């Protein structure tokens, strides 16, 4: 056991009104986790964490802990907060294979999960534990979604997702890789074959454009495409990155590891939108930052930039007469992603909302009865823990829906 993990656990004050738990989007019982850890009840602690958050191992690595649990720790008022993420990671990771998921008796009903990202995995695990026969349909060859194809391995090792695949197969969950619903196989086909309910968790994979000249040039890449397979992209010796969220930090830090000598992130405002930890890690890796700058055009050998200012109403505008050229070998656009809508195009019962994401009601049901959705396909690009938080509620709603329709023919 790493010494610092035990030292951090001993720093916990076991607050009667734990602010750390209030800071967690899924209300992880952090004091109880630490108490069990100190009493050497690791497997009990791991089972508790998994029951509350099936993606506990992942979240312990990629959550914005400085804003959530650790950011609310009272120890942080006059010093450093308890390093809760290290404790959670040690427990969840070391005991993962030994966690015994409580499984209800099979109830004879099937549910389909479309998409094996954070939302889909959460739904599949929770419904399988309730006795449903689950099949996951995934367009790629492995599970993980954005966790595998959008988060660098130095932040989230792919081996963790492979272990999740093994765990899910042990739970009886079936997996159809390299298979896209919409087109040859429709949602109606799934209902015809006896699936009582369908979950859509297809994520947000379409890059948001900057809508400036030069965006189609060969030296321009989108963050989601680059992070999918960095080894296939030659960025040259210098890269300009536009956008300052966690994806931009992932691109910048990956580029450094790929040998790019000059990596610069440009942000229109005076601070990044990434988590403070990711920002600091990027600076430590050697990433440069330029604020109050925006791209107006991309050239074959660089970018045209203009200085910006933030008005009183919060709107960012360019300063006239400040346009200047900055040379670089390549450009990466990291200004978020939006969902693709193949399913909507092939299923008239599904509708979009005013934001261009899949429309659902307060219970997560889409405009097509029996079809539910959550995660980035509904909210736009969010975090793993956000997907888990909403998907836990959706799993309960799907369970209630299927129980209410269990006697329907081909429901």
What are these regions (language model features)?
Residues 177-193, 292-302, 308-309:
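A conserved short coil-to-beta-strand element within the FAD-binding core of flavoproteins
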Residues 216-236, 313-381:
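FAD-site-proximal beta/loop scaffold in flavoenzymes
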Residues 54, 117-118, 142, 245-247, ...:
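Residue-level detector of alpha-helix initiation sites
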Residues 136, 140-171, 175, 252-296, ...:
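Rossmann-like dinucleotide-binding cores of NAD(P)H-dependent redox enzymes
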Residues 88-104, 163-183, 206-258, 352-367:
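Glycine-rich dinucleotide-binding loop and its adjacent helix/turn
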Residues 109-135, 248-256:
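N-terminal Rossmann-like FAD-binding beta1-loop-alpha1 element of flavoenzymes
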Residues 1-110, 200-217, 287, 299-301, ...:
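Ferredoxin-type iron-sulfur electron-transfer modules and their immediate structural context
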